[in-house]
């Protein structure tokens, strides 16, 4: 059995270390070593455990989610910031420029924007376009959800977009192959609240407004240093063809487990929390399991990250009985958690030149009405006649898929050098 374990560790370690070289970090990167060890898991004591370890992303997704969590949140602070590793990666602002550049160390600007999903508006002649505006703490108004958002991608993801010129519409028109990201790709979508606005964010939930319980970082707005608290984030990786999907929230988020509950079979005790009948309230803290506590103890990470909870993971569009799976968090999918499915929503990420112009695919099913798609993808979203004779080539494509990455159709730079995701 020790030989089998060595094979598992070798396969997983090789896959992740190969990606590690592309991360532009030192060859002896302790964060990557920790993640490789975490993904390999404990030495299997049975054939079932051995087989589970062969494909942990599908067989043990909650553990894999925490392995990724500890990796992307590895302490990367330098003078003047409190960066986790993902905060040093490329943002949409870095990626969707006429000349994308990997960010340098120690930036004091966090490129926050208003959350994308609640701010979609209809585009003529069809489809939806993101209504993206820069976010700052000065925009916070009484009675409004005051949240900023950012998307970050690691070096392999950034390089794939840059090297294939997928950051411009002209580049997408010229790229004739199927878009398939490398297996070491990782993306994070993070939501932040100004620390000074935490009381308003938590109002009515019974949660304490204590910034020390949060991962905090600062940015410069109008020449002033402003502190932000991390409240939630999505985390995806290309370990499997349809990516891994996980969402995390701070333990004190109002309504954290509303509608779909919270489920974490690896890191939480108890592993499942049912939704309250009265929405918007505080839920009990997600007490960490002994296995997860041991992983935290061996990681170089801001201690405040122990206050974050895995809301859930997603590995497929449906369960084994064909029931549509759902996943969404109370901040990013605020207002439509009941119809949120990360894998289905991102599976619709696509663009079209079919009418001669440019159009990203719709996010919501009914234009700007916030009803998300769930379940398997509809081939009619991509092909004009998807049910034609299977022995003949499919008819004209309508939309071209972007391998579950919405930033490409949302943010691709137009002929004038502008991106809808980048403030000028």
What residues fall within each predicted segment?
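Sec/Tat signal peptide C-region and signal peptidase I cleavage site
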Residues: 20-24
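Bacterial N-terminal signal peptides that target proteins for export
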Residues: 1-10
């Amino acid at each position: 059995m020790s030989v089998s374990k060595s094979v598992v560790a070798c396969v997983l370690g090789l896959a992740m270390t190969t990606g590690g070289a592309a991360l532009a970090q030192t060859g002896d990167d302790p964060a990557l070593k920790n993640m490789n060890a975490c993904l390999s898991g404990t030495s299997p004591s049975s054939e079932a455990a051995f087989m589970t370890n062969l494909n942990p992303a599908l067989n043990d997704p909650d553990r894999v989610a925490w392995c990724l969590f500890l990796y992307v949140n590895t302490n990367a602070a330098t003078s003047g910031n409190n960066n986790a590793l993902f905060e040093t990666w490329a943002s949409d602002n870095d990626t969707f420029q006429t000349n994308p550049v990997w960010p340098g160390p120690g930036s004091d600007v966090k490129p926050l924007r208003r959350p994308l999903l609640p701010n979609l508006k209809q585009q003529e002649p069809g489809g939806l376009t993101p209504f993206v505006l820069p976010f700052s703490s000065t925009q916070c108004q009484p009675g409004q959800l005051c949240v900023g958002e950012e998307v970050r991608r690691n070096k392999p993801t950034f390089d794939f977009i840059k090297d294939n010129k997928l950051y411009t519409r002209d580049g997408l028109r010229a790229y004739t192959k199927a878009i398939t990201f490398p297996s070491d790709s990782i993306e994070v979508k993070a939501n932040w609240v100004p620390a000074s606005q935490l009381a308003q964010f938590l109002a009515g939930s019974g949660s304490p407004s204590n910034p020390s319980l949060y991962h905090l970082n600062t940015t410069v707005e109008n020449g002033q240093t402003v502190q932000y608290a991390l409240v939630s984030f999505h985390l995806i990786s290309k370990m499997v063809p349809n990516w891994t999907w996980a969402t995390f929230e701070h333990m004190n988020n109002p309504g954290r487990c509303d509608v779909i509950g919270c489920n974490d079979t690896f890191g939480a005790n108890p592993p499942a929390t049912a939704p309250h009948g009265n929405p918007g309230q505080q839920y009990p803290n997600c007490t960490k399991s002994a296995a997860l506590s041991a992983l935290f103890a061996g990681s170089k990470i801001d201690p405040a990250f122990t206050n974050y909870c895995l809301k859930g993971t997603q590995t497929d569009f449906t369960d084994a009985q064909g029931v549509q799976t759902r996943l969404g968090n109370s901040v990013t999918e605020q207002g439509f958690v009941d119809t949120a499915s990360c894998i289905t929503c991102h599976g619709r990420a696509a663009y079209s030149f079919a009418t001669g112009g440019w159009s990203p695919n719709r996010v919501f099913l009914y234009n700007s009405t916030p009803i998300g798609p769930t379940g398997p993808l509809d081939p009619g979203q991509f092909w004009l006649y998807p049910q034609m004779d299977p022995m003949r080539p499919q008819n004209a494509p309508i939309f071209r898929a972007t391998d579950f990455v919405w930033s490409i159709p949302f943010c691709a730079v137009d002929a004038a050098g502008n991106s809808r995701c980048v403030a000028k």
